[in-house]
Each structure stands twice: as structure tokens, then as C-alpha cells.
Amino acid sequence: MCVSRLVLLFGLLLCVGAQLSNAQHWSHGWYPGGKRELDSFGTSEISEEIKLCEAGECSYLRPQRRNVLRNIILDALARELQKRK
């Protein structure tokens, strides 16, 4: 009886785990069945952020800890002021 409950629990956990996991992974430009988008070979798409990083203006790579802390404090103060009104 204990073994059958254990097998049932294991099977249930396996089914739930398979549903919750992201087992299917598709790379960029690939579709299900191994088909690839043909237009992606001819054009090279470089985003504006990458162009800015090459120019040395990469703001998202710099540490923003001071700004984050300042924004948290300002948001907290704004909430307090709204509560008082």
C-alpha cells in the first residue's frame, strides 16, 4: 500500500514538473520542427542600444545603485505625501 502511494505521488510530481518546466527551447530564428527563418541570414539587425555601447555610451552596463536607492527613497516619500493628502 505504501509503495503504490509512493509510485502515485512520484507519477503526479513528474506530470506536474513536466507541465511547469520550460522543456521546449527554441533558438532565435528557429521554429518548431527545425525550420529556420530564411530572411534572418541576409539582414543584420543591430539595435540602437548596441550601437550606443560601441560608442561608449552604455548606460545599462554602468552600476546604477545610487539611482536605484534614490528612486526608492523618492517613491517612498511620494507615497507618504499621497497618504497625508
From Swiss-Prot:
The keyword Cell inner membrane does not apply. One of its GO terms (molecular function) is gonadotropin-releasing hormone receptor binding. Keywords: Amidation, Cleavage on pair of basic residues, Hormone, Pyrrolidone carboxylic acid, Secreted, Signal. GO terms for cellular component: extracellular space. It holds the Pfam family GnRH. PROSITE patterns: GNRH. The modification Glycine amide is found at G33. Residues 1-23 form the signal peptide. It comes from the Eukaryota. It is found in: Secreted. Stimulates the secretion of gonadotropins. Belongs to the GnRH family. This is Progonadoliberin-2. The gene is gnrh2.
